[in-house]
């Protein structure tokens, strides 16, 4: 399902992830999908 997220959905995930410094750092290295699911669980879309 990760490949089917819209840019708007990805941006909203980034906004959540950026509130958590560890998640933001992981996003920079692993990507937003991996970082979000690691810290917040399954993507809700």
Curated annotation (Swiss-Prot):
Every Gla domain range: 1-41
Residues binding Ca(2+) 2, per UniProt: 15, 18
Keyword line: Biomineralization, Calcium, Disulfide bond, Gamma-carboxyglutamic acid, Hormone, Metal-binding, Secreted
Chain sites annotated for binding Ca(2+) 1: 11
Top-level taxon of origin: Eukaryota
Location within or outside the cell: Secreted
Membrane-spanning parts: none
Official protein name in the record: Osteocalcin 1
Species classification: Eukaryota, Metazoa, Chordata, Craniata, Vertebrata
Gene: bglap
